[in-house]
Amino acid sequence: MPWNWQLPDWPHFTWDSPRLLRAETLFARQAGIVAGALAHLEPATRQTLLVDSMRDEALDTSAIEGELLDRASLQSSIRRHLGLQANRDAGPAEAGIAELMVALHHAPTRPLDHETLFAWHRLLMKAWQSRLSTGRYRSHPEPMQIVSGPDYKRRIHFEAPPSDCVEDEMTRLLAWLERTAVDGPSPLPPLARAGIAHLWFECIHPFEDGNGRIGRAIVEYLLVQSFGQPLMTGVAGSFLRQRKAYYRALEAASRRLDATDWLLWFAAATIEAARRSEDRIAFVLDKARLLRGVEARLNTRQMKALLRMFEAGPEDFIGGLSAANYRAITGTSTATATRDLSELVVLGALLRTGSGKGSRYHLAIPQRRVEPSLL
């Protein structure tokens, strides 16, 4: 069975627009909720949220490829590129993707072109410049294949167009993106445009390495471009949580030009990501309210533990904080941990579940769990 780029109608993707209409409506509504919530935050809080969002997007898009970055170094590097105070140096991998994240969220009106993609690739591959051809499309004569398994039982998941076709293929994709922009002659809704662009880019697989991360960067860039402001969408996190399904959806779409199934999957994942962004903003407001009510009555250990729980975000510590966790965070004794935690419950900062050694403590704010969007 041929790959989609070998079909006569390539690269003319088709999809069932009426089936995608509900998803576009849901996403536009969700994006509006997020944008409205961001607009009502204090500037410093909004800036912190944006930094955290870019940090998590960088961590997640890298984790999809099996690359683990240093969280603190990455956050510090993002702050530095935004002109904010930074308290530590970053390695080349963290520094490069940090600069890429800032570029994605601060130049949304600029059309994508070859040079922009080359610049992104150089940033992304900063730590591997001595081993890879960076900032240019691949040129090797060998087939570009995505494979798995040992040599004697290798499975080819995808084979991309030959290297000598890549520049022309990318020129067609970039021209399509310009035509389908909000102010272009053939504008497309945000999800259809970003979803097709991601699929099309991955089918070309134009770089020697880093195609998945660049492809997901394109998604973020196009969504920001569609709405004219950062949305903290965090699509990479949604893809990471459904990593196997993400790869299956891309692999299935690589055999056909009807992209309906791919777009429906992509839309559901992107809407889920937007809902998590709303949850994140609500968490920030909830924790601010909680702190205002108890801050003056906390000792330094209690404050340290609460701040650690806040730092973990709305999805961590869902199983609850244990006394052992508290001791590890604060370096205190068992008796002191028990007393501190009991006081936090009385103050209304924490809720306790279970009893004895099974006691678990939760922040006294709404626990929100976002389920995958069903379209």
Task: List each model region and its residues.
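FIC/Doc superfamily catalytic core
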Residues: 1-375
